[in-house]
């Protein structure tokens, strides 16, 4: 049963033919009734995910396991660049359609050089995609009350959609109190206890996912690396990376083990993993002997080691010994250039997500995705959804309502629904 998608601003159309999509058709053949007219049936969530997976075109390339050659390098710089370009396009559209520009506020306490560098890089990244950035710098001896005051002001500021408190804070401040003060709707770092709690619960979704773990999973998705049913090991159990990374892998239906400083036989446990995410901050700790042939390795560690040949006197390496592990694994992230660029890219993505949620702004792609989910679940609900869009709740605003977004035709060429 072919279904034709056409964007009425274009003369092109896409034909989705379920009969020729063999894997999907085999899964769903008993759900569909062959007919010249357009018909729908209730499908389960598993099938929806199957459709989504097979119709997606966002991945970069499939990673093939090849034990005879060195591992494929997962290019975090390239993926982060793609994401930043995608974010910039959506921000431009948001500005044009509803006049809103996402805003990110950063609070920096003290004069740590590394923290100042991180904040400077975040501001530069915001500027590159069109996000307004706001910055507050406080002295090392500032009080916790001063920090909370600025957080409260940003919580109430409608031009600010994301708030980030640069860690670590000075020792005289209660870090948890400060993080808890950030409005959960603007917690783009994803560290609020309610966001972490929702991440841990089945059937609940956090408003935001912590940026570094989110970047790790995004790399796996963009390279078409399967997670479902795989054995995954997370090395490290920090609140910032290890714990949320394990929760995300579990949400993707992986069987997850966490290796930490009290784990006995960490090498033996790690060697069973199809996917390894390491975030412990120990240079070259994971050797080639720890890696199962064909495993995929995501290295979060950034560790300086002495290097007399380097102008700086040191070089950066990860937790995983790249030279050894790359001979065994099927894919591996480099350090630098792997997970690092993804962290800031995910921060930009979370800030955009916050602005879209606050202002109820959605892209055509998101409208189509949600519509098809409704179609597969229930035809009548889909009709109600389409009429809601047309009549009174167009997500792209009044100007967009004047032009159809897309149309669906049956086999006889008759237009079934016109969305506009």
Regions found by a protein language model. Give the residues of each.
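N-terminal chloroplast transit peptides
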Residues: 1-41
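Positively charged, low-complexity intrinsically disordered leader regions
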Residues: 47-98
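Anion-binding alpha/beta catalytic cores of soluble intermediary-metabolism enzymes, centered on
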Residues: 69, 74, 161-231
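Short beta-strand elements in bilobed, periplasmic/extracellular small-molecule ligand-binding domains
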Residues: 104, 126-140, 256-257
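Glycine-rich phosphate/diphosphate-binding loop of Rossmann-like nucleotide-binding domains
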Residues: 109-124, 203-296, 300, 305, ...
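Short, well-structured alpha-helical segments in soluble
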Residues: 146-158
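Rossmann-fold NAD(P)-binding glycine/threonine-rich loop
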Residues: 178, 196, 301-358
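Intrinsic disorder/low-complexity segments
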Residues: 408-409
């Amino acid at each position: 049963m072919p279904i034709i998608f056409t964007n009425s601003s274009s003369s092109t159309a896409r034909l989705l033919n379920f009969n020729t999509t063999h894997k999907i058709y085999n899964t769903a053949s008993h759900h569909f009734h062959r007919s010249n007219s357009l018909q729908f049936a209730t499908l389960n969530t598993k099938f929806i995910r199957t459709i989504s997976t097979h119709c997606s075109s966002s991945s970069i390339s499939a990673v093939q396991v090849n034990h005879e050659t060195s591992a494929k390098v997962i290019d975090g710089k390239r993926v982060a660049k793609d994401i930043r370009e995608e974010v910039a396009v959506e921000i431009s559209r948001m500005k044009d359609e509803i006049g809103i520009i996402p805003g990110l506020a950063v609070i920096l306490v003290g004069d740590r050089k590394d923290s100042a560098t991180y904040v400077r890089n975040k501001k530069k990244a915001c500027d590159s995609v069109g996000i307004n950035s706001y910055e507050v710098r406080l002295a090392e001896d500032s009080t916790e009350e001063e920090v909370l005051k600025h957080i409260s002001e940003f919580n109430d500021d409608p031009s600010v959609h994301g708030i980030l408190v640069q860690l670590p804070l000075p020792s005289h401040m209660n870090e948890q109190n400060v993080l808890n003060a950030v409005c959960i709707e603007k917690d783009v770092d994803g560290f609020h206890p309610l966001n972490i709690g929702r991440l841990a619960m089945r059937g609940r979704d956090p408003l935001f996912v912590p940026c570094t773990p989110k970047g790790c999973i995004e790399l796996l998705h963009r390279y078409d690396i399967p997670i479902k049913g795989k054995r995954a090991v997370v090395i490290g159990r920090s609140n910032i990376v290890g714990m949320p990374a394990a929760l995300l892998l579990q949400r993707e239906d992986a069987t997850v083990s966490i290796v930490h400083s009290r784990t006995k036989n960490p090498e033996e446990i790690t060697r069973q993993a199809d996917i390894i995410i390491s975030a412990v901050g120990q240079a070259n700790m994971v050797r080639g002997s720890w890696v199962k042939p064909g495993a995929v390795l995501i290295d979060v560690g950034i560790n300086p080691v002495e290097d007399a040949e380097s102008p700086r006197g040191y070089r950066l390496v990860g937790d995983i010994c790249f030279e050894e592990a790359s001979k065994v694994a099927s894919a591996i992230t480099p350090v630098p250039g792997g997970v690092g660029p993804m962290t800031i890219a995910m921060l930009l993505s979370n800030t955009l997500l916050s602005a879209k949620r606050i202002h109820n702004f959605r892209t055509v792609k998101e409208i189509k995705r949600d519509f098809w989910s409704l179609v597969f679940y229930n035809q009548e609900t889909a009709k109600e959804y389409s009429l809601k869009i047309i009549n009174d709740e167009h997500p792209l605003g009044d100007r967009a309502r004047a032009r159809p977004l897309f149309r669906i035709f049956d086999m006889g060429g008759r237009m079934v629904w016109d969305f506009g």
